[in-house]
Amino acid sequence: MNIGYASKTLGLPEGRMRSLAMRNASDERLAEAIGANLSALEAVIRYCGANGIRLFRVGSDVIPFGSSPANRLDWAHAFGERLAAIGALAARNQVRLSMHPGQYTVLNSPDDDVVRRAVADLAYHAAFLDALGTGAEAKVVLHVGGAYGDKEAALERFVARCRELDASVRRRLVAENDDRLFTAEDALAASEACGIPMVLDVLHHRLNRGPGGRDGLELLDAAARTWGPQDGPQKVHYAQQAPGRRPGSHADTIGLDGFLAFAASLEGRAPDVMLEVKDKNVSALKCLNALDAHGTTAMLERAWAAYKYSVLEHGQAAYQQVRNLLKDKAAYPVREFYRLVDGALARPAPPGSARNAAQHVWGYVSGAASARERASFARLMERYEGGQADLVAVKRHLARLAGRYGQEYLLHSYYFDL
């Protein structure tokens, strides 16, 4: 089973995308932002390849204002060689790329202006994947859209407009079910009518099955038949419901018990699974580790190196429990490891524990820090302990120092992101 995640990579500062305000969208500023974002995408692809992550969803803003008149830059020409090199990098690292336009890209709207913008946005997404040189397996995922008081007519509009799209767009388009309006059966019917694949969103199907909706495996197999050889392996979206939030809200992290039950329920099927989760690559690595039948303690120790100061922030007890767990080098206690880590991170961070973790992190930079920087950190900690500064300010300050003094171990941990 191939597993991936969307858009943002935690613990990888070189993978952060740059944004740009529309008022600043000059050709020069756009070129700078695009260049920086392509560097970030290269870093993410290398990260995915090195960690066995085979799917990555590229954020729509990789080319700022890609489908807007605000971007007058011929980016596909200006960055053509570099884009092709990135596509080749993804191929070498066996990373399947995709994109997912946002909620305002609505192909079935009754408003012609909204549709015009949606068509332009889909064309931009397809053009970006074309510029990378990817095949038709690199998909653009789209929800059916709104119901506008007449769901059947709205579904018919989606099909009609999908058929009118340029072939370069249609060969990449995939229809997805949503959590409120269009069920998996609706999305499947639309995909079959359009001649495009359908991606099954597992959480959305659980929340919005609809009357007469088939069960998971039967529906999964029906969706699989919409994927042709040119489309690559079938894809599904997997998320878990966030406790205490509105239905459809994605959880902060993937719980292993639920994920492993889902994997077992596939009964040997191995679709590509895109995780939709707040902690992104963190959950992707967790799920890959849990599925690895030949996992080692060394793998968990690498994971622990990224987690440990985040766990320490939430309490000394869990931190020590994990350290003790990893002493047996012959074992692979992957489920217990993540039970302890996830349990710690789910609890509020006591101020004393957060202070202790911050002091540990400070220890990496204190020797190189100037007298002024040491005094500044001491004042900040006094303000934190007195309630005049929050933990976010403390961690932001430490992140700046870690970057200034090249503390890669810290920068590539989750401490500044979780």
Residue ranges of model-derived segments:
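Residue-level marker for buried hydrophobic side chains located in beta-strands
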Residues: 97, 173, 198-201
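Alpha/beta catalytic barrel-like cores
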Residues: 1-95, 105-119, 127-134, 164, ...
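Eukaryote-skewed repeat-based solenoidal scaffolds used as protein-protein interaction platforms
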Residues: 124-193, 203
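Short active-site loop/helix that positions an aromatic residue
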Residues: 206-210
